[in-house]
C-alpha cells in the first residue's frame, strides 16, 4: 500500500517560545498565520536562598530539543511535511543571565532569572557611584538601576563564582541572555555556534546604548564588564545561522533551517499583536505582566516610573522602533504560589472556579510583592501582603483577590502610561496564558473601565517570533506589509461596573500597596540572612507567626 502523500500547506515557520515557566515550539502557516501544531514542557525554578531564583541552562536547552522533536512528530501524524519549515524564530524570557564555557559548551553557573533579588546590595553600592543618581544609566539605556536587569547579575557572577572568574581570565567565557545561549547551541555550540543577540534583548542588559544601538563602553567600565564576553548585536529579523544536528535531536530534524528571528518575549508579543503604529499597546499576562506601548522612532522617557526600551528592528536596514514599558514582576506567578506554596488550589485552572464561587474578594486585598515592586514604584523593600481579612474570608476570596491584584497592577501601569503619552488608550489588547481566564479578563475591563480585547489565537509571542523569522532577508516567506497581514478575530470584554465602584476598589488597593513598602531591609537577599526578623521584637514575631499559622489553617479548611 502506498504511503499517504504529505500535505503541502505552503511555507511554514517555527518558533521557540522560551519563558520563565515553560518552553514551547510552535509551527505556523506563513500565509495564514494559522497555528498548526505545538508542544510544551514546563521548566523548573530553583530557590536556593530567600530572594534567589535560578534555572538550569542545560534543562532549558534540552526542553527546546524535546519541544522541537515532539512538534515534528505531531506534524508527521497530521501528514504535514516538516521540510516545509523554512525558518525558525526565537522568543525568550528577557534579562535572565547565563555565562558558559565556549570550549566545552558547559554553563559555568545556573541562569540567574530576571526575578532574582540577590544583587540588591550591589545595586545600592553602584547607585552611590552614579553622578546625578540614576540618570547616568537611564539616559543611555532607558532603564533604572535595578536588580531586574542583566548587568548587575553578571557583575554578581564575576564577583562570586570562581569558575566564571577563571573562564573570563582565560578567554573562555561567553555571556548571554537566554536567546544567545539557545542560538549559540542550536547553530553548533562548540562547533561554530553563533554568539549573538538582538537589539530587544540587548536593550534589557543595562549595558546597551539604545540611541547608538551598540554596547556602551562607559557602561561596561562602570559595571566592570569585559566587552569581549558580550554577544554580537543583530537586528530582530535576519539570518543568524543554520540549525545543526544535535545528538539530542532525533534524525537531525530541521537540519540546515535558518534561525532568522529573535525578540525578547514582550517585543515578540507586540509584533504578534501587530502593534506596528505609534500609540498602539498590548499587555501580556504571563509569569509577570508587561504593558508595552509603541512610541515609533522616538525614545520617550517616562516621568512616571516606566521603562524606555527597544520594541523591535525588523531587518538590518530597517528603522528601530521604541516602546514605553510597564513591568509587573508577579502575575501568573501568584497563581503558581497559591498552588505550590499554600496548596489552596491543585491546578492553575482551578483558581477561576474558586473566584467564580464568590464573585468578590469581600474587602480582601492581595499585594504579591514577592520580589519587591517593579513599575511604577521600583521599590525593592516591598513584600507581599494580604490584608482586609475577616472571619468570613475563605480561600475563594483569597483566589479572587489574587486575580484582582494582577488587574490593579495593570491599572497602575496604564495610568502612568496615559500620563506619559498624554493620549489615554480607548481599549487594551491582551495576550498570554492567563487571558484564558474569563473572570480575570472581565475584572481587568472593570478595573480599567475600558474594553479589553483578546485575540482568538492567544499565541502572539510565538507568532511575533515566527513573523520576524519568516520576513527576514534571504527567507522572505512572511510579508509584514499591512495589506498582507492576516485579520485576527477578537473577543471583547466590556466594563460591567460603574466608574465610581471601579475607583473605590482601586484607591483601596493603593492603600494596601503603601502598607507593603518598606517591609524589609534590602541586604537580606544577597546575604541569605532574613534581616527583617532582626528588627522585630521576639514576642511580636512569635505572636504574629502564630496568627498567620492559624489563619492559613482556617482558610485552607484544616480543623
UniProtKB/Swiss-Prot annotation:
GO MF assignments = ATP binding; glycerol kinase activity; histone binding; metal ion binding
Return the InterPro entries for the record: ATPase_NBD (IPR043129), Carb_kinase_FGGY (IPR000577), Carb_kinase_FGGY_CS (IPR018483), FGGY_C (IPR018485), FGGY_N (IPR018484), GK1-3_metazoan-type (IPR042018), Glycerol_kin (IPR005999)
GO terms in the biological process aspect are: glucose homeostasis; glycerol catabolic process; glycerol metabolic process; glycerol-3-phosphate biosynthetic process; regulation of fatty acid metabolic process; response to ethanol; response to norepinephrine; response to xenobiotic stimulus
UniProt binding sites for ADP: 20, 24, 287, 332, 433, 437
What Enzyme Commission number(s) does the record list for this chain? 2.7.1.30
Keyword Disulfide bond part of the UniProt annotation: no
- The UniProt record gives the binding positions of ATP as 20-22, 287, 332, 433
- Pathway entry: Polyol metabolism; glycerol degradation via glycerol kinase pathway; sn-glycerol 3-phosphate from glycerol: step 1/1
Please indicate if the UniProt record lists Amino-acid biosynthesis as a keyword: no
The catalysed reaction is: glycerol + ATP = sn-glycerol 3-phosphate + ADP + H(+)
Binding-site residues, glycerol: 94-95, 148, 265-266
Q: Which UniProt keywords apply?
A: ATP-binding, Cytoplasm, Glycerol metabolism, Kinase, Membrane, Metal-binding, Mitochondrion, Mitochondrion outer membrane, Nucleotide-binding, Nucleus, Transferase, Transmembrane, Transmembrane helix, Zinc
- CDD domains cross-referenced by the UniProt entry: ASKHA_NBD_FGGY_GK1-3-like
Where is it localised? Mitochondrion outer membrane; Nucleus; Cytoplasm, Cytosol
Annotated positions binding Zn(2+)? 501
Q: State a GO cellular component annotated for this protein.
A: cytosol
**Main localisation:** mitochondrion
**Membrane topology term:** Single-pass membrane protein
Kindly provide the name given to this protein in its UniProt entry: Glycerol kinase
What family, per the record? Belongs to the FGGY kinase family.
> What is the recorded function of this protein according to its Swiss-Prot or TrEMBL entry?
Kinase that plays a key role in glycerol metabolism, catalyzing its phosphorylation to produce sn-glycerol 3-phosphate. Sn-glycerol 3-phosphate is a crucial intermediate in various metabolic pathways, such as the synthesis of glycerolipids and triglycerides, glycogenesis, glycolysis and gluconeogenesis.
* Coiled-coil intervals, chain numbering: none
Amino acid at each position: 500500500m502506498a504511503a499517504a502523500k504529505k500535505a503541502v500547506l505552503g511555507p511554514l515557520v517555527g518558533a521557540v517560545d522560551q519563558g520563565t515557566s515553560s518552553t514551547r515550539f510552535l509551527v505556523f502557516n506563513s500565509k495564514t498565520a494559522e497555528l498548526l501544531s505545538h508542544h510544551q514542557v514546563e521548566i523548573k525554578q530553583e530557590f536556593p536562598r530567600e530572594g534567589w531564583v535560578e534555572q538550569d541552562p542545560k534543562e532549558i536547552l534540552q526542553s527546546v530539543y524535546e519541544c522541537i522533536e515532539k512538534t515534528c512528530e505531531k506534524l508527521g501524524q497530521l501528514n504535514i511535511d516538516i521540510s516545509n519549515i523554512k525558518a525558525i524564530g526565537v522568543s525568550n524570557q528577557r534579562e535572565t543571565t547565563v555565562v558558559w564555557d565556549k570550549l566545552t559548551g558547559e554553563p559555568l553557573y545556573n541562569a540567574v532569572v530576571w526575578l532574582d533579588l540577590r544583587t540588591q546590595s550591589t545595586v545600592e553600592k553602584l547607585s552611590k557611584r552614579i553622578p546625578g543618581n540614576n540618570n547616568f544609566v537611564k539616559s543611555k539605556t532607558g532603564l533604572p538601576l535595578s536588580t531586574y536587569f542583566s548587568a548587575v547579575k553578571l557583575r554578581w557572577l564575576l564577583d562570586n563564582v570562581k569558575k566564571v572568574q577563571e573562564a573570563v581570565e582565560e578567554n573562555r567565557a561567553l555571556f548571554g541572555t537566554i536567546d544567545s545561549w539557545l542560538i549559540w547551541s542550536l547553530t553548533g555550540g562548540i562547533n561554530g555556534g553563533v554568539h549573538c543577540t538582538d537589539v530587544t534583548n540587548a536593550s534589557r542588559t543595562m549595558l546597551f546604548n539604545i540611541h547608538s544601538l551598540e554596547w556602551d563602553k562607559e557602561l561596561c567600565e562602570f559595571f566592570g564588564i569585559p566587552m569581549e564576553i558580550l554577544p554580537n548585536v543583530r537586528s530582530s529579523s535576519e539570518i543568524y545561522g543554520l540549525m545543526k544536528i544535535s545528538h539530542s535531536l532525533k534524525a537531525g530534524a530541521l537540519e540546515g533551517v535558518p534561525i532568522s528571528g529573535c525578540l525578547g518575549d514582550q517585543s515578540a508579543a507586540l509584533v504578534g499583536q501587530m502593534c506596528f503604529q505609534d500609540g498602539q499597546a498590548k499587555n501580556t499576562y504571563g509569569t509577570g505582566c508587561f504593558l508595552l506601548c509603541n512610541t515609533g522612532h522616538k525614545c520617550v522617557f517616562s516621568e512616571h516610573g516606566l521603562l524606555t526600551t527597544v520594541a523591535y528592528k525588523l531587518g538590518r536596514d530597517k528603522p528601530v522602533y521604541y516602546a514605553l514599558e510597564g513591568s509587573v514582576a508577579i502575575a501568573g506567578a501568584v497563581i503558581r504560589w497559591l498552588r505550590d506554596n499554600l496548596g489552596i488550589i491543585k491546578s492553575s485552572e482551578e483558581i477561576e472556579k474558586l473566584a467564580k464561587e464568590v464573585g468578590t474578594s469581600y474587602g480582601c486585598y492581595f499585594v504579591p510583592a514577592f520580589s519587591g515592586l517593579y513599575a511604577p514604584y521600583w521599590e525593592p523593600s516591598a513584600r507581599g501582603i494580604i490584608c482586609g481579612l475577616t472571619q468570613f474570608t475563605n480561600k475563594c476570596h483569597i483566589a479572587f483577590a489574587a486575580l484582582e491584584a494582577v488587574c490593579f497592577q495593570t491599572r497602575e501601569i496604564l495610568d502612568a502610561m496615559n500620563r506619559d503619552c498624554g493620549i489615554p488608550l480607548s481599549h487594551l489588547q491582551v495576550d498570554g496564558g492567563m487571558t484564558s481566564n474569563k473572570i480575570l479578563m472581565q475584572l481587568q475591563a472593570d478595573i480599567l473601565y475600558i474594553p479589553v480585547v483578546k485575540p482568538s489565537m492567544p499565541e502572539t509571542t510565538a507568532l511575533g517570533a515566527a513573523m520576524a523569522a519568516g520576513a527576514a532577508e534571504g527567507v522572505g516567506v512572511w510579508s509584514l506589509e499591512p495589506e498582507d497581514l492576516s485579520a485576527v478575530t477578537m473577543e471583547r470584554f466590556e466594563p460591567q461596573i460603574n466608574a465610581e465602584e471601579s475607583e473605590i476598589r482601586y484607591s483601596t488597593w493603593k492603600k494596601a500597596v503603601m502598607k507593603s513598602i518598606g517591609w524589609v531591609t534590602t541586604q537580606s537577599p544577597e546575604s541569605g540572612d532574613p534581616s527583617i526578623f532582626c528588627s522585630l521584637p521576639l514576642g511580636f514575631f512569635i505572636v504574629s507567626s502564630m496568627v498567620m499559622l492559624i489563619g492559613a489553617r482556617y482558610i485552607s479548611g484544616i480543623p
